Amino acid sequence: MTGASTTTATMRQRWQAVMMNNYGTPPIALASGDGAVVTDVDGRTYIDLLGGIAVNVLGHRHPAVIEAVTRQMSTLGHTSNLYATEPGIALAEELVALLGADQRTRVFFCNSGAEANEAAFKLSRLTGRTKLVAAHDAFHGRTMGSLALTGQPAKQTPFAPLPGDVTHVGYGDVDALAAAVDDHTAAVFLEPIMGESGVVVPPAGYLAAARDITARRGALLVLDEVQTGMGRTGAFFAHQHDGITPDVVTLAKGLGGGLPIGACLAVGPAAELLTPGLHGSTFGGNPVCAAAALAVLRVLASDGLVRRAEVLGKSLRHGIEALGHPLIDHVRGRGLLLGIALTAPHAKDAEATARDAGYLVNAAAPDVIRLAPPLIIAEAQLDGFVAALPAILDRAVGAP
């Protein structure tokens, strides 16, 4: 049921007829993309400043990803986890090298960030301890284990009781973290920047303090880099800005350049916790997704996109702050993961007026607009957004 009669209106009707209502009905239906531009079924174009929520680090239809996926699919599409393939091994080798730990590091592949965090949850149980510590307002996924770690009652309460012995503490509060971690704590789960809660950046030294606290108590430090990894903040892993090495890192989103793949990297003793039969994933390490991820890693390196994310992010942040718009309180984040904090809860309105103006953004909180564009976005496209932002915000609050 596609063709000339397909419009946003008809697509919305078809969606409502067959899709579960967990997302509501999307306001537009997209048909194609190229670079940082997407086109809807009505032929209207938008600058994509959300990148599939930090997924499309190379934008849409990147030739390197297309070539890698096409070549691999024409050779070997899927094998299950019963057999080894070159793309999976090569991808694990590259991720281990990028993490750069001075101890043995091992990788488990899965399909998403939630699955990567579930794997980390299970690793923590294998320490022989059961207590976990995470942050209020954190987001680690919606499967039951990752949901238990997610510090958002609105998402948790409908599904209670949740697994685990999880204590939530204030994000960025070193004293609260130290008080919560004891000799029974298996792991502390933290995001280097809390993306889903409004691009919340912790105080300087927080991650280093968390590393010290967990090391002293013999607990694992698990860093959820699902949104902050893949060069988005100006370092391949956001925690590398702090010069620390966690015990476990989870990764997904941008790793596959649009294809579903997640990874759980474990360092040192944590790398030896899983033994045959304790965990698995039918699709994890799928050679097509792994080939796509290898292509993403190589383009990030060859095109200098990690450093570029840092430079463009600073320019974008300064440009927005320089507007001096009364609805803008401040801009926070790092690299090309930014949150425009507003003086009033108009982020959802601004998401809609930005879309009307041809820009896709996201209301990560009632008063925060999240930006997570492709790392290949042109500077001129970002400049265009900055120029359009005052009118977008004015319309969001009903100003003439």
From Swiss-Prot:
Positions carrying N6-(pyridoxal phosphate)lysine: 253
Catalytic activity: N(2)-acetyl-L-ornithine + 2-oxoglutarate = N-acetyl-L-glutamate 5-semialdehyde + L-glutamate
The keyword Protein biosynthesis is assigned to this record: no
GO cellular component: cytoplasm
Chief localization: cytoplasm
Requisite cofactors: pyridoxal 5'-phosphate
InterPro entries named in the record: AcOrn/SuccOrn_fam, Aminotrans_3, Aminotrans_3_PPA_site, Class-III_PLP-dep_AT, PyrdxlP-dep_Trfase, PyrdxlP-dep_Trfase_major, PyrdxlP-dep_Trfase_small
Miscellaneous notes: May also have succinyldiaminopimelate aminotransferase activity, thus carrying out the corresponding step in lysine biosynthesis.
PANTHER family: ACETYLORNITHINE AMINOTRANSFERASE, MITOCHONDRIAL (PTHR11986:SF79), AMINOTRANSFERASE CLASS III (PTHR11986)
Record's protein name: Acetylornithine aminotransferase
Native species: Mycobacterium tuberculosis (strain ATCC 25618 / H37Rv)
